[in-house]
Design a protein with these regions (language model features):
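N-terminal phosphate-binding loop and flanking beta/alpha elements of the actin-like ATPase fold
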Residues: 1-38, 44-141
């Protein structure tokens, strides 16, 4: 039995996931019927529930401090990096100094940009598994 691998385009604002079908890549549709998936994560301030993608994006106006977008811009960057300083002008959530690195603070907890990105990747993997009906073990990002 062959294993299915997926290809993921993890973007700053939008992401996509594809699988090979009939020798050709097929970009999967989200539950909303879109080929692109918002690279957004939110934590519900009342319930603590994590939302990813379109559900996170939809509640951003009501929950801006706990809605994380553009997280890819902070990956591997120091807190005092000029890119971080500039990006902070365009977001509403808190970026904090965690041992010199740029981390995101949500409801008093600090998360690395990589950890938040992993939540997006996990949702894309789940989307692919739901589509293929198989467990996905390999991915190219």
């Amino acid at each position: 039995m062959s294993r299915k691998a997926i290809g993921i385009d993890l973007g700053s604002t939008m992401s996509e996931v594809a699988v090979i079908e009939g020798g050709e890549p097929k970009v999967m549709l989200t539950t909303e019927g879109s080929r692109t998936f918002p690279s957004v994560v939110a934590i519900d301030k009342k319930t603590g529930e994590r939302k990813v993608g379109a559900p996170a994006k939809r509640q951003a106006i009501m929950n801006p401090k706990n809605t994380i977008n553009l997280v890819k811009r902070f990956m591997g960057r120091k807190f005092d990096d000029p890119e971080v300083i500039e990006a902070k002008k365009h977001i509403q959530y808190d970026i904090v100094n965690h041992n010199g690195w740029a981390y995101i603070q949500i409801e008093g907890k600090e998360y690395s940009p990589q950890q938040i990105s992993s939540w997006i990747l996990a949702e894309l993997k789940k989307m692919a598994e739901d589509y293929t009906g198989e467990t996905i073990t390999d991915a190219v990002i």
